[in-house]
Amino acid sequence: MNVENLTQDAVNLLCKLIEIPSTSREEKEAADALAEVMQKDYGLKTEREGNNLWCIADGYDEAKKTLLLNAHIDTVKPTSLWTRDPHKATIEGDCIYGLGSNDDGASLVSLVEVFRCLKDKELPYNLILAISAEEEVSGKNGMEHLLTVLPKIDVALVGEPTGMQPAIAEKGLMVLDVTAHGKAGHAARDEGDNAIYHALDDIAWVRNYRFPKESGLLGPVKMTATIINAGTQHNVIPSECQFTIDIRSNEQYSNEEIYEIVCQNLKSEVKARSFRLSSSRIDMGHPLVQKAISLGRTPFGSPTLSDQALMRFPSMKMGPGNSSRSHTADEFIKISEISEAIQLYYELLKDLFL
């Protein structure tokens, strides 16, 4: 394995992808370009569903366990604070600047290069590479759809910026839309029933309640009121007040359990947008985790959401870059981080026994 050549290929591919806008649900052009490189330049037999791409390594055997390599092709929209063109890949010293360079382009190109190295080897497991769309919006046409067309997966390695440290647990997400009901009236008279005051009582509970079961890796469930809206004009007592709750769950609770606790304690009407995005965890004793530890990696719990939330099998999140750079102006990745990722991914996977 020539790490220098693979790193250069990865950098070239990353620069190509940075210059193609690929916000969530608008990844077609980037997927077209990536598929062309994978098929024509790398000789990878590439399948496609929508804007999702995947490859299955030679020698697939249903009797073997299957490991999935995953990264996402979509990006968030650039903020107004960029001082550079977010869609122009700029190399300055060791840094590559551009939208999606850190999240999630570096993981994507590193995993593609490692898959190239491993696809023809006789591995004791099946290897699949999947590049998913719509990760940033947890869309139904990304990983959720991919999992309906891929073979059965036993474990996944999800490439996200973690400094190449293994995240073995990840917080889930549930968003609740809450409506407090009152009765309209004239603000000058002692009439009506102010929905804002009912909402404030419930928001006070949201602010002060602590879920009793905490996680050693992920800490407590985090519940935050983030949006509030009520009223139409200053002299009318509002009959409704809507507010939104953002809940980041740990693995001690299902989203359904948290929803029931909230409903039991709020007087307002509560609706969950979805229960899909669950907290995830892989056992510390899993061979993938143990191999990472043997390579000097330190397991941790991640507060940020990824496509792991849609995976109903064990998964570990590990990739080049730093999560703090994601979704920020002048996002960047270091070329040395990509080189390190290619080497570590290869060492992690080449002699792995599941």
Q: Residue spans of the language-model regions?
A:
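Hydrophobic/aromatic beta-strand patches that form the interior of the parallel beta-sheet core
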Residues: L67-L69, A130, L157, M316-M318
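Acidic/histidine-rich catalytic neighborhood of metal-dependent amide-processing enzymes
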Residues: G105-V175, T179
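Buried hydrophobic packing segments
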Residues: L34, L108-L118, L146, A199-D202, ...
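N-terminal helical capping/dimerization or prosegment-like subdomains
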Residues: M1-P78, E240-T244, I258-I261, I335-Y346, ...
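Active-site beta-loop-alpha junctions enriched in small/polar residues
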Residues: T23, H72-D74, E134-E136, T162, ...
